[in-house]
Regions:
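Redox cofactor-anchoring modules in respiratory/redox and cofactor-processing assemblies
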Residues: 4-175
């Protein structure tokens, strides 16, 4: 069975729309700690090895879906905010890195961002999880730290133009 055939995607298998009527923009195959997938990856088989071969993971087993009305910058900021709050503070990369990432994402989302913030985010992500490899390199006591960069890195990789628009248009352009 591939991801497209999972119950969550409803009639996407026949080219239909998501439940709210929008078209698929992106999805996360294994909860918010996993790298994002695009619509072209709906036919990836729903198995640990197959998803790992596409540089992601099934993780918690939840599939997070974004339709065309979803702002990827806002989604990545909210996920980063969650991870920042979950950090126990014991490890420096997680404690310092998650807070810094959250503040930069907040700036981009709320109108204070700069174009340089995009590359700064990627640099910080690389410092938390060196090389941004999958599976992530362990730089902290637990796996929370190396999971934090996944959403930001994926969102920038897939939707860099939307990050640029946030940095140059005083924040989010979505309603």
């Amino acid at each position: 069975m591939c991801i497209r055939d999972s119950f969550f995607f409803g009639d996407l298998a026949s080219g239909g729309a998501l439940v709210r009527g929008g078209k698929l923009k992106a999805f996360i195959p294994g909860g918010v700690s996993a790298p994002w997938f695009g619509p072209d990856q709906l036919d990836v088989p729903l198995g640990q090895d197959e998803v790992a071969n596409q540089a992601s993971m099934l993780g918690s087993g939840s599939i997070v879906v974004f339709d065309e009305a979803t702002c990827p910058v806002r989604a990545a900021w909210r996920i980063t905010k969650f991870f920042s709050r979950e950090s126990c503070g014991q490890c420096t990369p997680c404690r310092e890195g998650s807070g810094w990432l959250e503040r930069i994402m907040y700036r981009l989302e709320h109108g204070g961002g700069r174009i340089e913030d995009i590359d700064l985010l990627l640099d910080l992500c690389d410092n938390i999880s060196p090389g941004l490899l999958w599976p992530p390199q362990q730089t902290t006591i637990c796996v929370l730290g190396p999971s934090i960069p996944s959403s930001i890195h994926s969102a920038i990789k897939m939707f860099r133009d939307e990050f640029v628009a946030h940095a140059t248009n005083d924040g989010c352009t979505y309603a």
